[in-house]
């Protein structure tokens, strides 16, 4: 059970902290606000009652306003039910609708103080009608039990049992015993629901002090054990005036009892399952008696000024006046946080990746999709774990949408083939929607491309022949380039550049793309216009790369283009006059050390070797 000090000290003092932390009364429609209110047979001022109900929605004294999720009303007669429903509907914020849960009464109950009625927000809850029960509590009265199920949640722990009761009034041992009997009947029913059930005991319990046996029976051990958000200490006297709920009036008139604010008759008592800050749970510091500023002990709530909203006296006084006119009780309110909603989306890795590529990842974006303010939504812990082609395990706390945390899972690229894996995003949070989300991943790991100068073997160097006529037209030589070994598990290949530097050679077409099973090619041109008969070699460097995917590699092959030139002059007949003689010798010597026509062996330099070749061809 919680320490009483935590809540007594945490009430009005905590308001300022909540106002700051919750961003100054921002709307928070997803939180579950619960109101317990004795409407005194609907004999009070109807307009004032409607305005009090509206104030229950608008109340931001603990940091945020939220349309009420559950109203539990006491002293409802069959004849007044339609008027109460009209008041609930008239006070509802735009866009929100309320449904009447199962309503039961009897002639004896209806002729006495009336029954209990629950109205719930249809966007938050549905009622499981079979979960309703009437529980006899004495004095011709029944307590009611309703089972409400949260919309958008599948977990059984997102269900809320609400007990509504109006126990026997007045002092005296006989009346106390009857109240005790009523509490014991509710506890017996709640205990039978099993462990861990989320339950609220609400209503006008008519307890006169904190030592009354009926009050204490709520805290007995068992599945339905309750705790008091205000602590179990005394609520008597001026120092506890802020806890009181009856009577907001100092006069008895028109069916409404006076006496001033000096009793705590109205309660919302949660069970332990709502005390763990996990899933559906009470938000600390939000339990309050609406309009009770703690300064009206034993007098009317609207006597003088009311300071329930310290910075807005007019608002406080208007609320106090309406409370005075509406009934002879004031509403008790508590706010509950809602369970988390796990949301995980995948940013998939590339569909194809080169083997042994580094830095390849899948990303998982994790968020808590439950709408509302952080204070009203269960903070969601998560784990994201990779399996198969993915690896790594990462933990964190998810922000509310639209924000998200990004978890990066490495992709293993060591093994070629179609690889699969799973990113599993889980949360241990109680009653969380989608507690486990499995995100499948598929990625194909491919070998690097493999340039080859042959389509039948892996060849990195080869001679490609060609023929030309001295002084004739240019000759184009096509060099085929294959992606050797290509299949679905190998990268396609691009030819990115072709380089040739030998005299009389040039590149005509030096690039190609997406070479797979069909070879590509480059084209090199030889111009024989100024050459003589002979053999001319040119190294051609062909550079390649993989397709543009992670891990892309580069490679190269070298083809030697060998052109055989026929016709025209002999190689040593430099002036082409039909005779190798002194004139040719003079031309060769004039070109000494250069790369010119006197380079008879095509080694790039006119030197002694070329001189020897010329002399051997003399005449």
Roles of regions detected by a PLM:
Residues 2-16:
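Bacterial N-terminal signal peptides that target proteins for export
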Residues 13-25:
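Bacterial N-terminal signal peptides
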Residues 30-340:
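Divalent cation-coordinating acidic motifs and surrounding scaffolds
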Residues 69, 197, 330, 357-358, ...:
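Surface-exposed loop/turn positions
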Residues 82-87, 574-595, 603-619:
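Alpha-helical segments with a strong preference for the paired helices of cellulosomal dockerin domains
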Residues 338-568:
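Feature for long, exposed domains in two main contexts
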